[in-house]
Curated annotation (Swiss-Prot):
SUPFAM superfamilies: Mitochondrial cytochrome c oxidase subunit VIIc (aka VIIIa)
Main location as per UniProt: mitochondrion
Record's bilayer topology term: Single-pass membrane protein
Protein's pathway: Energy metabolism; oxidative phosphorylation
Primary gene name: COX7C
Function: Component of the cytochrome c oxidase, the last enzyme in the mitochondrial electron transport chain which drives oxidative phosphorylation. The respiratory chain contains 3 multisubunit complexes succinate dehydrogenase (complex II, CII), ubiquinol-cytochrome c oxidoreductase (cytochrome b-c1 complex, complex III, CIII) and cytochrome c oxidase (complex IV, CIV), that cooperate to transfer electrons derived from NADH and succinate to molecular oxygen, creating an electrochemical gradient over the inner membrane that drives transmembrane transport and the ATP synthase.
Protein name: Cytochrome c oxidase subunit 7C, mitochondrial
């Protein structure tokens, strides 16, 4: 009895929830402004790429 009511509740919750669909709608950031996206992605990936080099430079200058 309890299992049936739980199963009905979870399926009704899934059925009632609706999200926008389509390209770019399931991302946690906006892709509408391509220049803002370019700046954000360049900072994100650029900082990840530069971090090891900056750490090595810091270690070499420390000696």
């Amino acid at each position: 009895m309890l299992g049936h009511s739980i199963r009905r509740f979870t399926t009704s919750v899934v059925r009632r929830s609706h999200y926008e669909e389509g390209p770019g709608k399931n991302l946690p950031f906006s892709v509408k402004n391509k220049w803002a996206l370019l700046v954000k992605m360049s900072l994100y990936f650029g900082s990840a790429f530069a971090t090891p080099f900056l750490i090595v430079r810091h270690q070499l200058l420390k000696q």
